[in-house]
């Protein structure tokens, strides 16, 4: 599998109560879990017959368990040279929270942030390439950043990842995707309700949104993952039955019926039926 530089390649969930999170996502998405062992801190590989991502108990920057940290999904982007990428990130106004580290023979990772503070991961593959966005229910199919500094972040992703920042004409907000056609993987949204996208075409998977009007008070700029489901309304009902919350009720969009929800520990994510 070949994955382009700057494309979403992995997600992981950090949760204060990992066992409860496992039960929730097993019921909602049918996720299966495989432990990687103590050498990897109890990290779980998640699948639905194809790779989905990973899950782990929350840890601080010292590698210590820290249940005070919020539940959250982290999106990782592929890079060819992780050391050069982290240098580019700081040179273009971003931050490095976790410096590049080797993960066995799998590859290397880092945790960084855009100028707005939206955190994300980097992955330089060795033996493990990550996932492919198959569109199967329970897998991640779209990656979107809601940002309080749209212009700075759009320029940042363009300069660091080579994203094309393609405006999304069908959006009511300022929104761009990283490319067009089959190369589109992510989006960036202006919180003032104006949109733009980072790619275009059938492979668009990410977007950038100006979040100044869309972000609730106190919620920082962030990357949000959207998962495929067969029936959004049924999935929302399941989320509520399992103790989760609805942030945006189901609505029809040009790309399919869509909602934003959160698990019982507060991790937000989107669901879409296409």
Question: Which residues fall in each region the model found?
Answer:
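Short, low-complexity cationic-aromatic patches
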Residues: 2-6, 17-18, 22, 63-72, ...
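Core segments of cupin and vicinal oxygen chelate
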Residues: 3-5, 9-51, 91, 99-107, ...
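Short, structured motif recognition centered on aromatic/hydrophobic residues
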Residues: 8-12, 70-79, 96, 120-123, ...
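Ligand-binding pocket scaffold of soluble enzyme catalytic domains
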Residues: 12, 21, 29-30, 34-36, ...
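Vicinal oxygen chelate
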Residues: 17-19, 47-51, 75-116, 150, ...
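Conserved donor-binding loop and adjoining core beta-sheet/short helix segment
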Residues: 49, 54-66, 191
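Surface-exposed beta-loop interaction hotspot
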Residues: 110-169
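Glycine/small-residue-rich hydrophobic helix-like segments
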Residues: 179-191, 201-251
């Amino acid at each position: 599998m070949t994955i382009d530089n700057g494309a979403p390649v992995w997600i992981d969930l950090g949760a204060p109560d990992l066992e409860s999170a496992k039960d929730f996502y097993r019921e909602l998405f049918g996720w299966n879990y495989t432990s990687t062992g103590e050498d990897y801190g109890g990290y779980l590989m998640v699948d639905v017959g194809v790779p989905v991502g990973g899950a782990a108990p929350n840890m601080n920057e010292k590698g210590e368990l820290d249940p005070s940290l919020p539940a959250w999904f982290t999106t990782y982007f592929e890079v060819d040279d992780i050391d050069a990428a982290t240098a580019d990130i700081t040179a273009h106004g971003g931050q490095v929270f976790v410096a590049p580290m080797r993960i066995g023979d799998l590859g290397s990772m880092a945790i960084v942030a855009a100028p707005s503070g939206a955190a994300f991961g980097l992955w330089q593959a060795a033996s493990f390439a990550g996932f492919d966005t198959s569109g199967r229910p329970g897998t991640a199919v779209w990656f979107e950043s809601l940002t309080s500094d749209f212009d700075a972040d759009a320029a940042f992703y363009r300069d660091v990842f080579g994203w094309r920042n393609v405006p999304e004409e069908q959006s009511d907000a300022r929104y761009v995707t990283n490319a067009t056609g089959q190369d589109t993987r992510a989006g960036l949204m202006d919180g003032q309700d104006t949109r733009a996208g980072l790619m275009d075409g059938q492979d668009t998977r990410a977007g950038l949104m100006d979040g100044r009007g869309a972000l609730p008070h106190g919620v920082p700029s962030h990357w949000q993952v959207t998962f495929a489901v067969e029936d959004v309304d049924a999935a929302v009902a399941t989320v509520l039955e399992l103790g989760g919350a609805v942030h945006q009720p189901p609505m029809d969009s040009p790309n399919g019926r869509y909602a934003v929800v959160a698990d019982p520990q507060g991790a937000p994510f989107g669901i879409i039926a296409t």
